[in-house]
Amino acid sequence: MVATSSKRTLDPKEEHLPADKTSTNSSNTIISELATQEKSSSSGTTLKLIALNIKSISDEDVGYIQNVERLSLRKNHLTSLPASFKRLSRLQYLDLHNNNFKEIPYILTQCPQLEILDLSSNEIEALPDEISSFWQDNIRVLSLKDNNVTSIRNLKSITKLNKLSILDLEDNKIPKEELDQVQSYTPFHTGIPKEEYWAIAISRYLKDHPNLPTPEPKISRAAKRMGFINTNLSNGAMNENNIISLAPSANTTISASTAMVSSNQTSATSFSGTVNAESEQSGAVNGTELYNHTKYNDYFKRLSILPEESMSNGHQKISHAELVVSCRKLLFSFTECQQAIRKIASFCKEKAVAVNVVSLLYSVRSHTDNLVEVLQQTENEDESHDQALIKLCLTIITNFKQIITLLRKNFEIFFKEDDLCFIRMFYMTLMCAYMEMYNAWSFIKEDDQVSGSASKAPKKHSFSRHETSSSSITSGGGPAASTTSTHCSGNIKLLPKTRSTRTPSASALLSNSNILTGDTTAVPLLSPNLNGAHTHGPILGHQNAISNGSSQTNMNEVKTTSDTIPRQQLLQHNKSISDSKKESQAHEPKQHPVMTSSIINASNSNNVSNVNITPPPMNGGGAANSSANVVETNIDIQLYQTLSTVVKMVSVVYNQLTSEISKIAIASTMGKQILTDSLAPKIRDLTETCRQAMDLSKQLNERLNVLIPNDSNSEKYLTSLEKLKTWEIMNSFLKVIISILANTKIVMSDVPNLNELRPNLANLAKITKDVTVILDLSSYKAVSVSANSPE
């Protein structure tokens, strides 16, 4: 079940030792073994006491082995160790395999030099809660293979073992669901060595999830119909005298424990009326007392023999067709969210933070591909795969919850330097995706529950009819906001609440009139303040790509007055501004449609960079030309910055490829791997492509270092001739990247280790695609067209 470390044994010939070797005195046995092994070994630091039927070790025995560094007591019958065992101050390796320990002896935590501990094939259920400073700083390898560990909750103290690198948990009874959660939180492809994966992954998961959820006890449907409440005792057993009580109403519950304490009369509302049940003088409640009333006897008997519905875990059935439609809606939401978050992560300057999001996105991509395959199978085959669909959707939703948590935790790192237009688009994409999730939930939910949610938001929603809890984002403020409730999975909130935060409704967010006219006073989104930081609040009179020449002045006027005048005066002021804008537009010449389209497209390209591009006003030919130049200049800056990121990513991929190719060469030299006639030329082609990429990276990086500052030194590279040279270098660089991706994919089938590069290769492919889009919008495209056109 769990990845294991390699077997460690102190004696390779131990299997040939007699299994029935016995000794009545452990001291005599230890002395004789010491004498025997001292003759064969000059060091005297290694002692093997294997399969000697030792049942206990005395303080006297410890005195004989005080200088031992490696000790093996495997295949004995030990159940405890003496307190004097801590006197083994040099002990570094201890093998207690195949003994009878039911818990880890506390005295082992007091061994000052112990680094490797093998406790496999015992009956241990948990790690000790208290970990000494010796273990915190020294323990590197711990084997609990073939024990009685039933949950990773029992290993919570593993988070204190700072040096632990290898943890063996194979052949325990840990639920697969818990291991899946650990693997989902820390995927295998995060660069962790396989033998160290479980030690790091479980420790990381337990650190970030200190309070793991405890499964709720299941209640039988018959008990629910009869109005009884089942509660398990601490040991999991069911006691009829403690667990049966009558549920009086929807708001109150009379439990058995309350009836045991109180000697007063308790009023209980039944299905047909109200009765008073008096507890006995001793306070004990008899579980059968309820049936002594003939009024209820026949009724409850009839309820108790009603047939149970043939459903697993009490879930309500939905048709396969409904489930498929809902999964398609969720697939759309997953895809949109993934693309939006990927762009946000690509802009993050803190790569150590961004790599966590990228890792989760890669996991989402993998599960999404699996979801698409399962949906295709359901369409092409007669068999249904409902459980697989549900499991994949829940796994992806869990990953998105973790991603949103990371975005909220590092909010400023991801969003502080981003352009406002892009943040608005990102927010809108998430809102639309959540709305589609709500549509999927509504589609498979019962009609009465869906209609009831219009008047009162339910506490729990689910994507299938399972009892998967989720919270809702409710709209607030204003009549329009109260008409729609937007629900999302889990406690996911993109933006932290502040005094000026107000969650917009779907109608307010999707209002075309507000967006097109620039009047976004009803849309609370992010807006930059005077210091460049982001605050939450409404955007007043935002200037967009189709505003006229006076819009810049109007926006400044509104910003100046919005903090000093009342709301009614502000509305009148906005109305007068709108009238003046219409009057000025009536006397202005009609704008050229091509120019308008190009500027709108240029402004929309903000989603691939964090450089602010403000669409300029268009009042005439000269103004249009100057504004077009400004847009091109800003797009060029975007291009330089994105290319700089690509150069760094190519360097990372190059180093990884070089490392793997070197390993292949070394393995081939040592005879561990044979280079076939087909593999050798593939590796040569890949090596040559990487060399070309690094040469072009060097040339391009030299130019980018001069162009990015955008000062007087960059002018020498802004002539038509130099721009054409830069264009050719960029094109060659992008072609080489495509060749690297293609050649690496070809070699992957023969060299499986290259699969570890997939996340970085995927990111490189995506950002390269973004570069091609920006390159077509930049001024370099026009230079290349003019150079290639016939005179």
Swiss-Prot record:
Pfam families on file: LRR_4, SOG2
Subcellular location as annotated: Cytoplasm
Keywords, comma-separated and alphabetical: Cell cycle, Cell division, Cytoplasm, Leucine-rich repeat, Phosphoprotein, Repeat
Organism encoding this protein: Saccharomyces cerevisiae (strain ATCC 204508 / S288c) (Baker's yeast)
Biased composition regions of type Low complexity, renumbered to the chain: 469-486
One GO-annotated biological process of the protein: budding cell apical bud growth
Positions where Phosphothreonine occurs in the chain: T214
LRR repeats, residue ranges: 43-64, 67-88, 90-111, 113-134, 138-159, 163-183
Protein name per the record: Leucine-rich repeat-containing protein SOG2
GO cellular component: cellular bud; cytoplasm; incipient cellular bud site; mating projection tip
Chain segments carrying region Disordered: 1-28, 454-506, 534-569
